[in-house]
Every structure is written in C-alpha cells, then in structure tokens.
C-alpha cells in the first residue's frame, strides 16, 4: 500500500482541496472513497481517523483540510 492515502467522501469540498493539493505538488497517493465503499470508513476509523478527509502519511494522520500540516508531513 502507498504510504500516502486519502480517505474521502466524493462530494466533500475539503476532500477535493486535499486531492488538488497532492496533485499540484506531484505527490503520489492512493484514494479511498468512503461514500462508495462505507467499509473503508470503518477501516480508517480503526486506524485512528475521526473526521474526513483523513490523510494517512506513513503512520501519521492529517484530518480535514490543513495545508500547513500537510506541508509539514510531506516536507514541502
């Protein structure tokens, strides 16, 4: 599994911002749609997520749209 994974809801504005941010910075990542596959939300919650989007970068979680936290975790 890619060490960078976004658990997202397809209609979520913050989810779209995170995906756009990753794409704009050339970050390779996997996307897990929790709306289409609700079992993925349970998987993310078991790993510590409380809110979505939940971005897992290695073993760290960034929840919601937090550009500064994403930059710090990605070394940008």
Locate predicted features:
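Non-catalytic, surface beta->alpha helical segment in thiol-disulfide oxidoreductase systems
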Residues: 58-76
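ATP/adenylate-binding site constellation spanning eukaryotic-like Ser/Thr protein kinases
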Residues: 9, 49, 67
């Amino acid at each position: 599994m890619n060490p960078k994974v976004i658990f997202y809801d397809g209609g979520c504005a913050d989810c779209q911002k995170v995906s756009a941010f990753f794409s704009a910075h050339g970050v390779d990542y996997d996307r897990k749609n929790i709306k289409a596959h609700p079992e993925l939300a349970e998987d993310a919650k078991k790993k510590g997520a409380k809110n979505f989007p939940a971005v897992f970068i290695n073993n760290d979680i960034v929840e919601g749209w937090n550009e500064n936290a994403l930059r710090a975790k990605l070394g940008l």
